[in-house]
UniProtKB/Swiss-Prot annotation:
This is Small ribosomal subunit protein uS15. Keywords: Ribonucleoprotein, Ribosomal protein, RNA-binding, rRNA-binding. GO terms for biological process: translation. Gene3D superfamilies: 6.10.250.3130, S15/NS1, RNA-binding. One of the primary rRNA binding proteins, it binds directly to 16S rRNA where it helps nucleate assembly of the platform of the 30S subunit by binding and bridging several RNA helices of the 16S rRNA. InterPro entries: Ribosomal_uS15, Ribosomal_uS15_bac-type, uS15_NS1_RNA-bd_sf. The keyword RNA-binding applies. SUPFAM superfamilies: S15/NS1 RNA-binding domain. One of its GO terms (molecular function) is structural constituent of ribosome. Belongs to the universal ribosomal protein uS15 family. It comes from the Bacteria. Disulfide bonds: none annotated. It comes from Tolumonas auensis (strain DSM 9187 / NBRC 110442 / TA 4). The gene is rpsO.
């Protein structure tokens, strides 16, 4: 249920702010969004996977916290990120 190394590297390259940036809120939110999207497909097939659903809810909560932090610290970066990821339609 995790992303492969190539997908993670591509996401990090797309959303990083510097060369070795893997911990910025933008990168973390992008990685969580990719994992959440992957798990949504999993739950369409395995609807009774309640343990996996708990992990999904934890990821959604963590993404929400990171987005709140980013919005509080730098609103322009927040708006740019949600437009790139297609969140908040």
């Amino acid at each position: 249920m995790s992303l492969n190394a190539e997908t993670k590297a591509k996401i990090v390259a797309d959303f990083s702010r510097g060369t070795n940036d893997t911990g910025s809120p933008e990168v973390q939110v992008a990685l969580l969004t990719a994992q959440i999207n992957h798990l949504q497909g999993h739950f369409s097939v395995h609807s009774k996977d309640h343990h996996g659903r708990r992990g999904l809810l934890r990821m959604v909560s963590q993404r929400r916290k990171l987005l709140d932090y980013l919005k509080r610290k730098d609103d322009a970066r927040y708006k740019d990120l949600i437009s790139k990821l297609g969140l908040r339609r």
